[in-house]
Amino acid sequence: MKKSLILMAAIFLFSASCDRSHIQQAQVPVPAGDSELDREIRRVMEKGINLEERKRQIPAIAVAFARRTEPQRANRLAALCYLKTLGTPFMPMDMAEIALTETGGHGLASKSVSYKGARGVWQVMPVRARTHGYSARDLQDDEKCAEAAVRELYSKLLMANGNLVKAKKLYCGWGPQANAYEARRRQYRKELLEEMTRFAQQGDIREKVARAL
């Protein structure tokens, strides 16, 4: 119930303001471990680094999602990208890129199923979901799918020795298909960065107008 209330509050705030996203923080625990990478993650998060940057990414993500699905759902998915990466080494845009690459061409549909059996917006394989504590049916729930996807990307990050770009490619797999996946992901990242730049420019204009008044 608490998680649902936090998510509802986040969606409301995103809908009310596209250039300002003040969201209640909700911790998503990083998988247990005591590697150097784990310790570095904890040090970074304890300093509260990147919270403002995280917030700045949300409007751009919502706009990009809204090109593929209805605005209300776009806001909800953008909220999940923010909330489910708190307390992890990932940024909202990392999960947004994966969602767009996996199901952006299918309306970011929660019931998407690949020919290999991957499910949900983030296309997690059921066998992998089970290792993170989720069932195949859970993956058709956007919130649970996002949680499973974050944990799956984290496992790939460990495999990639902390190389996030490589981890994202491993999220798809290996070989030519993974190469094509990586090319698409970079295109979606470019789209998101362009939207972030546009919002930043709009913010600068508003600030200049406010100073002139």
Regions inferred by a protein language model and the residue ranges of each:
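Sec-dependent N-terminal signal peptides
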Residues: 4-13
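Catalytic glycan-binding domains that act on GlcNAc-containing polysaccharides
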Residues: 18, 22, 28-31, 38-213
